[in-house]
């Protein structure tokens, strides 16, 4: 029996043989995390643990002075993350690393950004089309040393002056050289630069705007079921099961996707039905 609340009047059962049930009760098999598809959203730090992340829109340290989204982990499409792995490897050979200021920005965050600053000079109007950040394949980045110290660049993040574009003739030589190095490495690894912002790069592979995946600040939940819930590779009841979470066991919810929640459980990432989980109080 699984995926059913404790107070449900009808409990669905998952067919198992007696031998299988006995094996699962006594032996915990080794489980290998499946490799995500390129279009799947993943937590970037899982795949690039030494990358530096400073999500400006998760705080008030941005041009609006307000918090735009309430999660503090960087999320991107897995295909984009694979390219960032190559970027980070190249930079590490130079004693540098990437520092990321913004990644996936849900459409809800784009609407909030527009509400705060309804000026198309500064913010993409979501009523006319979403920012590429809402596709999960775009990053705002800079160069830094491993200790977090940022290199000199033409401007700071979200500077709206002419100095922010990719005409580096109007900034000092050191800043220009650093910006050109960042641009070259990103392009070599499969990103295209935006001419108006030296920090803005988009994966050359396009993805659709993502309307259902909604990251949250990681929150502790437990399995609210009679026996167990299934941890699946994708947000679908037809997806493969990679683990079973016993009733009462706890895990971290990282994001919501329609009727599913993306969770982290026992060093695995997968999806469970939201109807059968409850927050730990």
Residue ranges and their predicted role:
Residues 2-7, 11-101, 113-196, 202-219:
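Extracytoplasmic cell-surface/polysaccharide-interacting catalytic and binding patches
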Residues 62-66, 230-233, 261:
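Short, solvent-exposed loop/turn elements at domain surfaces
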Residues 106:
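Segments that shape or occlude catalytic/ligand-binding pockets
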Residues 144, 234, 264-266:
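A generic structural motif
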Residues 217-230, 243-247, 254-257, 276-281:
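SH3-family beta-barrel domains
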Residues 235-240:
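Short alpha-helix capping/helix-loop boundary micro-motifs
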Residues 248, 261-265:
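SH3/SH3-like beta-barrel fold
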Residues 266-277:
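A short macromolecule-binding patch
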């Amino acid at each position: 029996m699984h995926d059913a609340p404790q107070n449900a009047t009808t409990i669905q059962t998952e067919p198992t043989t007696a031998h299988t049930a006995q094996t699962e009760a006594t032996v915990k098999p080794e489980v290998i995390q499946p490799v995500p598809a390129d279009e799947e959203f993943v937590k970037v730090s899982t795949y690039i643990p030494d990358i530096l992340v400073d999500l400006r829109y998760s705080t008030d340290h941005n041009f609006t002075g307000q918090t735009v989204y309430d999660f503090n982990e960087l999320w991107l499409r897995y295909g984009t993350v694979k390219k960032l792995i190559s970027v980070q490897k190249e930079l590490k050979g130079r004693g540098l690393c990437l520092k990321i200021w913004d990644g996936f920005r849900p459409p809800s965050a784009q609407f909030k950004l527009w509400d705060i600053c309804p000026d198309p000079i500064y913010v993409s109007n979501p009523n006319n089309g979403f920012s590429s950040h809402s596709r999960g394949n775009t990053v705002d980045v800079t160069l830094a040393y491993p200790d977090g110290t940022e290199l000199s660049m033409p401007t700071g993040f979200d500077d709206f002056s002419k100095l922010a574009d990719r005409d580096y003739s109007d900034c000092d030589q050191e800043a220009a050289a650093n910006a050109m190095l960042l641009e070259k490495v990103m392009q070599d690894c499969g990103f295209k630069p935006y001419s108006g912002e030296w920090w803005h790069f988009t994966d050359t592979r396009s993805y659709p705007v993502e309307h259902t995946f909604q990251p949250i600040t990681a929150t502790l939940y437990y399995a609210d079921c009679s026996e167990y819930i299934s941890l699946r590779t994708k947000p679908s009841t037809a997806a493969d099961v990679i683990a079973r979470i016993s009733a009462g066991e706890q895990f971290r919810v990282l994001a919501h996707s329609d009727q599913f929640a993306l969770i982290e459980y026992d060093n695995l990432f997968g999806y469970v039905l939201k109807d059968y989980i409850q927050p730990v109080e």
